[in-house]
Each structure stands twice: as C-alpha cells, then as structure tokens.
Amino acid sequence: MKLTKRQFQFIINCDVEQMIEFLMKEQGKSMVEAFDIVYNSTIYQKLTNEKTGLYLQSPEYIYDHLQEEMLSNKQQ
C-alpha cells in the first residue's frame, strides 16, 4: 500500500506526539526538552525515511529504540 505524503506525515506526527508524551511522563522531561530529544535523534531521521519502514511500527516500539539511543549517547 502506497501512502500519500499527507498520510505519511500524519503517521509521523502521531508517533512523535506519543514519544513526546512518553518522555514527559516517564522521564519528567519538559515539552521543549522532549521535542529537542526527538527531533535531534537518529531515530527521528529513520522514522521520517519512508524506506526504513520504521513508521509502520508502534509508538512504543519506536520509543524503546529512542531510549536505547539516549542511553548509548549518555555512555559515550
């Protein structure tokens, strides 16, 4: 199934919204901090690349990968 650009962007926006909520609720981040984390992550780059198919996964799955990236960045 081929999505229109509008449909694809809607899915991305919904996923980002969920990740922002998770960061705020689970990690106590402010909204600005949460947006900064998401939009500056490699996960966001992959999410917005239709070829990766990451946008087809659940927000929870995507958030788990974001958490792994955040942990990896802390350890460096």
Spans of features found by a protein language model:
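C-terminal alpha-helical interaction appendages
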Residues: M1-Q76
